[in-house]
Amino acid sequence: MSQAQIDEIFALLDSAAKVLIDQGVLPADWQNNSQITRSKSPEHGDYASNIALTAAKAAKSNPRALAEQLTAALPANDSIAKLEIAGPGFINIFLNTDAKFAVLDAIFAKNQKYGLTDEFANKKIQVEFVSANPTSSLHVGHGRGAAFGMSVANLLEAVGYEVTREYYVNDAGRQMDILATSTYLRYLQLNGEQIHFPVGGYQGDYVTDIAQTIKTQQNDAYVHSYADISANAPEDEVSEVNDAGEKEVVSGDKNAHIDVIIANSKQALGDNYAVFLNAALSEILGDIKDDLNEFGVRFERWFSEKSIADEIEPVLAELDSKGHLYEKDGNIWFRSTDFGDEKDRVVRRANGLTTYFASDIAYHKNKFERGFDTVINVWGADHHGYIARVRAALTALGIDEKRLEVILVQFVALWRGEEKIQMSSRSGKFVTLRELREEVGNDAARFYYVARKPEVHIDFDLELAKSQSKDNAVYYIQYAHARVCSVLEKLAAKGFDVDDAQGSAQQHLLTADAESELIKLLAAYPATLKRAATGYDPHVLTNYLKDLASLFHAWYNDNRILPVSIIADETPSQEELDMMQARLRLSKAVRQVLANGLSLLGLSAPTSM
């Protein structure tokens, strides 16, 4: 629905309510919390208001009787044709013809900007999303976070926010050491060393490929005996499959084992350890950037964890000065339970090293120091337990934790026939985002990733995503856009042009119920965008586009846009031309809104299919 129309109707009814306040029917302190909604069927008008129902208690009156008084007190307005009272006291509003078609004028006046507002201009918001460890290629689960985060950012920009999209690069810490050491062990193997590759290492072929590049460039310059690298390492994890078909640890400790391998590698290589870390980071992060760029996902900033290394100690000192840290068992703990967390959290281990959580405290403090009014973290559902400790840290630092929004994105289950693909980046057995995109295309992936609420699991149906039928929502939406383009091509091929002035002059001919419903749905687009943006919920827009495409296809199938006479190369009557131009105007409006919505979701609007 048109926000301008809603605001106008709300103001008119509010004026009527003020008349009743002056008459003593409503108390002076009554607040108008009513809603204007789009009517579901033409016989109930264009819009409906529940003002009489919400005000009845304050007026100590029957809602229908109060509705009669409100409609009687309503100021005269050229946009409203009539009012009807329905049911328990709803007020149905019927618009005049000119008011109905105002939305078409708005669409053609604004084109790609139709639906956009500056309501939240001068508000700065950061959306941090994906932020996958640069230890392997992105998998299909990361893809959902990418599509969701980008769509949310686009929607926020559509309503005026100044948005910064950010990827937090975890380029420091233990996972990077595991990656660097995994690469070094493969390098030793390529140079003829007999090694045991750790259970806790990164097993994918990409690690060997990186090691091969280093070997090609440096030959055996960094070789040390595996005996030295594995010296004093405790037994690695040994497991077997039990009777239930589950892997069961029999002996050993994979974490303790690889930690010694890492320490020995660092000692043996010295400064050259960075050769393996940097080579792996550069290769994998470059692949991630390329993958996301191909997916249409961009970031204003790639924020390195290393860049805040000097900010960790000051933030811990600040927490300590406020009495929020204490020592226990050699570790330094943050009193997270004082701020609602389920348990206190270690920020410095007994060995003197700070934890990942300590880095995250510094990172979040850094975010708010950059002046964002709101910070949105798009995290995987497995980070649920992490939210409370981050909010606790912000509160302890004197930052309003309500300025942090955390959106958890549930997992994606990918099905290929009867087989559910399991994913594990350490084992190297996972379906990458790139593989998914190559199979179903960017558009299908982007759409189905956001077609459900983020807290809902997705079972990604590959066959449906590739099908060309109305069951495939993204195909059906794009086909509606292409259908309009096809009509315009046929029109031009017959030697006729779209006459915008004539279409505007004849739009009063669009009196069919389906045409009225299409126009009302087009008018609802701006409000839909606002609801999707402020609710951080792109699936509101996907549902809207499905509804618009479905309604258009039904109307198109029942109504001929190009007259039979034109198709048959005969001279059309003036009546046929008038109706054609009116329907072309409506079709073009639908095409524009479909294109606008698809663009915000990062999808293409094809001209042919």
From Swiss-Prot:
Record-level Gene Ontology MF annotations: arginine-tRNA ligase activity; ATP binding
GO BP term, example: arginyl-tRNA aminoacylation
SMART domains for this protein: Arg_tRNA_synt_N, DALR_1
Motif ('HIGH' region): 132-142
Record GO cellular component, one term: cytoplasm
Pfam family, one: Arg_tRNA_synt_N
Keywords of this entry: Aminoacyl-tRNA synthetase, ATP-binding, Cytoplasm, Ligase, Nucleotide-binding, Protein biosynthesis
Catalytic activity: tRNA(Arg) + L-arginine + ATP = L-arginyl-tRNA(Arg) + AMP + diphosphate
Location(s) in or outside the cell: Cytoplasm
InterPro entries in the cross-refs: Arg-tRNA-ligase, Arg-tRNA-synth_N, Arg-tRNA-synth_N_sf, ArgRS_core, DALR_anticod-bd, Rossmann-like_a/b/a_fold, tRNAsynth_Ia_anticodon-bd
Enzyme Commission number(s) of this protein: 6.1.1.19
Class of this enzyme: ligase
Record-stated family: Belongs to the class-I aminoacyl-tRNA synthetase family.
Assembly mode: Monomer.
Protein name: Arginine--tRNA ligase
Source organism of the structure: Psychrobacter sp. (strain PRwf-1)
